[in-house]
């Protein structure tokens, strides 16, 4: 059963300008150490940050809160498996929120893409029915 769907699109130039202006302060505010390491080791770090940023927004929408009501940037962590597939780990208030929504086992599916100036993320949260 689907409990939430979220989508977000962001202009990559906005992330590029923010990184240029605030640098490490912005990165450390919005991204975990794992996300920073992964993004910095990508062919195009700015695009990687933008996709992760969009995924955090999309996930917070799927949780029904947006990045408000106690959900913070680092509460949603976008990392990759050994094959490069992105997945989401919830921490702190985001984890508390999903545990309020359901006590059952859940999955979070995320899809990321970028093209020229835009990055997009789609997130679906569903309960495993067994």
Predicted regions located by residue number:
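Core catalytic alpha/beta fold that binds nucleotide/phospho-ligands
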Residues: 1-130
